[in-house]
Amino acid sequence: MSDFRKEFIEFAIGRNVLCFGEFQTKAGRISPYFFNAGLFNDGESLGKLGQFYAKAILAAQLPFDMLFGPAYKGIPLVSSIAIALADGGNNYPFCFNRKEAKDHGEGGNLVGAPLAGRVLIVDDVISAGTSVRESVEYIHAAGATPAGVAIALDRMERGKGELSAVQEVRCMYGIPVTSIVNLENIVDYLREQGNLAHHLPAVEEYRARYSSRMVEPIECGGGTPRAG
């Protein structure tokens, strides 16, 4: 695990963004961990979060021309990521959408740089994939191309089918998805931390029960995903 990924997990735990215990998910599952990126809610934590995203994006070597953050959570994210990338000498334009169209001033649903070229979507997590779908629609409508998605946490958890939400996005849109950390990173971290090791059995049991059973790389389109 890269140093910045371990540092991000420690940062998230320190901000109570990543917690361990018993939590009910929207799907009705009892999860042994909970991730709430909304608690990165001050200037210092948002600035650090943008730096972690920037490191993950650069480490993934994704080719892109600009950033897009879907409303609402993506708005502060895309701003902080653009600043962090620029601080490292990588200056990219960015854009985000409004939930409601504006009929005065500049008007429309989009704010920021015009959507053009290869667009990297940024969000906190991918659950149902709704914000990614809406983002892709905005990008295509502008004549631009989705280049990929960057998220904070990949839960690696399947929905109703055998694929995880991230794998579904990869298959549906044919674009890469990168994350600062994933569930495997969290498991590895717990194994190394004596003071948190008591949470490991529950997390491993949850992973075994709900993680995607598809073998990476996933064969999409003409191929058939293979169960592992």
Swiss-Prot record:
GO terms for biological process: 'de novo' pyrimidine nucleobase biosynthetic process; 'de novo' UMP biosynthetic process; pyrimidine ribonucleoside biosynthetic process. Its EC number is 2.4.2.10. Orotate binds at F34, F35, S127, R155. GO terms for cellular component: cytoplasm. Keywords: Glycosyltransferase, Magnesium, Pyrimidine biosynthesis, Transferase. It comes from the Bacteria. Pathway: Pyrimidine metabolism; UMP biosynthesis via de novo pathway; UMP from orotate: step 1/2. It holds the Pfam family Pribosyltran. It catalyses: orotidine 5'-phosphate + diphosphate = orotate + 5-phospho-alpha-D-ribose 1-diphosphate. InterPro entries: OPRT, Or_phspho_trans_dom, PRibTrfase_dom, PRTase-like. 5-phospho-alpha-D-ribose 1-diphosphate binds at residues 26, 72-73, 98-99, 102, 104, 123-131. One of its GO terms (molecular function) is magnesium ion binding. Its cofactor is Mg(2+). Homodimer. Belongs to the purine/pyrimidine phosphoribosyltransferase family. PyrE subfamily. Catalyzes the transfer of a ribosyl phosphate group from 5-phosphoribose 1-diphosphate to orotate, leading to the formation of orotidine monophosphate (OMP). This is Orotate phosphoribosyltransferase. It comes from Nitrosospira multiformis (strain ATCC 25196 / NCIMB 11849 / C 71). The gene is pyrE.
